[in-house]
């Protein structure tokens, strides 16, 4: 009896003494930017109906509740208005209720604002995964603040613009979302406390989930009805590749021989190797299967090979056949290489010969193909001779030019080659208007032959002839110019470009001159000399036979006749 009585007393004592349970929750983290508002909530529940005390763990000081302080307690919330870097530390909240004591701690870190507007990863809130069906981004922690609309949104530190972006309450909606919308989004709003406004920003990443799709198989290699050439005894490797889309699905790429899978065909020298899965440039799933035939035989050419690709959309096959490849005839290859080398050498030699003897070849071709050509250009003369008739020199110099113009040129070009020349003083009748006749004769000539000599004096008549001839050749493009330079028998005086008109100087620099020097020409009337070859090359094709054609008839068919043969 005494023992039972004692046990009852102990039970009564236990029931009359209040019981307290202490509940502690792990430490959480929170962060903010300097000079912005930061509000954190006690990690423990029950603070809304029970008193909450906050302590700064670094100093074990209790944080006041008076709102006039920069940091104060409001129920279960701790407010930093605004936050400073030195506020960083561990804060502990204590919730007291009749049944228990709950404690929680927060590791608060206040950062300086990044100078380059790039938010580091440790200051980012949870990432939002978007899609075409869900393109909503929520501004984090906004529910803790006393905020008013609107909320401003930024992407990668740039304000969002355009009709695709819609801000509603604490959400951002993006229409027609795609991969270009991925990035870091920052919401910016205003918190109001005791009539004072504080700025709050929060950043989180947004990614777009790729929506997969599947398509009917597309074989990218080999082409349909592809033919592979292979030599007997060699190894043939043929790849079968196909793409199916981007979604996860059942796919297969394989080879068949006579509609039978390689594994069931029963020949060890014919194997199928699966290649690695690959993705194309547009993200599609592609598979490859390699058919390897070791030691190709004659029977392999009669088999039917199929590259097969399949998924739930269907099956597609590309037939492939083998064809015998003739072995390379190395002897024939040597002959071809040697022939091409000889041909190349011949072409090079021919080019060099033509470059060296081009004038001779051109004259020969002209004499053979077009010895006399009827020209319907309305021209009366083949060439008009322009020469200086007054000199600052001796009479001997004047006589040599006059003799060359009136005797040497006509004797060779008219008598031997059949050209018709117009020479001032020979073909112009007395009593005619010299200026009119000169201009008309130049206009009716196919070539303008300038005879240039040292110490030329620009007489009125000579200057006028030059002006008309150069205008016809350079401006009207009505004729061509031949420049003959009379070189003296010595080095004392040569042709000076400064004595010529500007247009004539330009022609001399562009096309050069044909030089005549009596002491360098063994036979002054020989058509085989370098001088007369160059003159004939620049002259047009004669339209009439030479005056001595009757004498030269028994000879070769050359147009220009060389009197040294008679």
From Swiss-Prot:
* Region listing for Flexible linker, in residue ranges: 204-216
Q: Which residues cross the membrane?
A: 332-354
Q: Where does the Ig-like C2-type domain lie?
A: 27-109, 120-207, 217-323
GO cellular component terms, semicolon-separated = cell surface; external side of plasma membrane; extracellular space; plasma membrane
Determine if NAD is one of this entry's keywords.
Answer: yes
Q: Which InterPro entries match?
A: Ig-like_dom, Ig-like_dom_sf, Ig-like_fold, Ig_sub, Ig_sub2, IL-1_rcpt_fam, IL-1_rcpt_I/II-typ, TIR_dom
Q: Where in the cell is it found?
A: Cell membrane
| Class of this enzyme | hydrolase
Tell me, what's a Pfam family for it?
A: TIR
* Signal sequence annotation: 1-26
Q: Name one GO biological process term.
A: negative regulation of type II interferon production
List the active-site residues.
465
> How is this protein situated with respect to the membrane?
Single-pass type I membrane protein
Tissue and organ distribution: Isoform A is detected in spleen, lung, bone marrow and lymh node. Isoform B is predominant in fibroblasts.
Where is the TIR domain positioned along the sequence?
379-539
Q: Which cysteines are joined by disulfide bonds?
A: 42-93, 117-157, 139-187, 240-307, 243-286
The Phosphoserine modification is found at 441
Mind listing the GO molecular function terms for this protein? interleukin-1 receptor activity; interleukin-33 binding; interleukin-33 receptor activity; NAD+ nucleosidase activity, cyclic ADP-ribose generating
**Recorded catalytic activity of this chain's protein:** NAD(+) + H2O = ADP-D-ribose + nicotinamide + H(+)
Q: Where, in residue ranges, is this chain on the Extracellular side?
A: 27-331
Entry note about domains = The TIR domain mediates NAD(+) hydrolase (NADase) activity. Self-association of TIR domains is required for NADase activity.
PANTHER family with a match to the protein in the record = INTERLEUKIN-1 RECEPTOR FAMILY MEMBER, INTERLEUKIN-1 RECEPTOR-LIKE 1
What's its job? Receptor for interleukin-33 (IL-33) which plays crucial roles in innate and adaptive immunity, contributing to tissue homeostasis and responses to environmental stresses together with coreceptor IL1RAP. Its stimulation recruits MYD88, IRAK1, IRAK4, and TRAF6, followed by phosphorylation of MAPK3/ERK1 and/or MAPK1/ERK2, MAPK14, and MAPK8. Possibly involved in helper T-cell function.
Per the record, the similarity remark reads: Belongs to the interleukin-1 receptor family.
Q: How does it assemble?
A: Interacts with MYD88, IRAK1, IRAK4, and TRAF6. Bound to its ligand IL-33, interacts with IL1RAP to form the minimal interleukin-33 signaling complex with a 1:1:1 stoichiometry. Interacts with KIT (bound to KITLG/SCF). A mast cell-specific KITLG/SCF-induced interleukin-33 signaling complex contains IL1RL1, IL1RAP, KIT and MYD88. Interacts with TMED1.
Q: What is this protein called?
A: Interleukin-1 receptor-like 1
Write the gene name. Il1rl1
